[in-house]
Amino acid sequence: MPFINALGYDVFNPLEVLPEMTCDIGTKKGEKIDYAIMKDDQPILLIECKHWKQDLNLHDNQLLRYFNVSKAKFGLLTNGIIYRFYTDLKEPNIMDDKPFLEVDITDLRDNQIEELKKFHKSYFDVDNDFSSASELKYM
């Protein structure tokens, strides 16, 4: 939650940050994403959190399942140290298998800080950030 707070969102306001948002997946009902950043009652960023010792490669399919049944354009998978940002550049509404941005907070670079700022509540624009994701992914 400190990261979400650093992005300018009120973690105690469910209109901004919805914890345990239900993402029904086919016959699997009641599946929940850890957090959803909301705007105008719609999820714009899904966040799946894992223990800091967890290998994120073991959990990207979980985020993919949630992403594919939601209207969110961005997904974030994190263990609190590594932050992987995903979107659907290859095929609409299907999360890409590779993140367009990966940040290790123990080794932050200036250009990564600039990219993270785009997800701050004051600047987050889904369409502009989608264009930025495309530029990052194909660099």
Where in the sequence are the language-model features?
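A short, conserved, highly charged catalytic patch centered on acidic carboxylates
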Residues: 1-74, 85-139
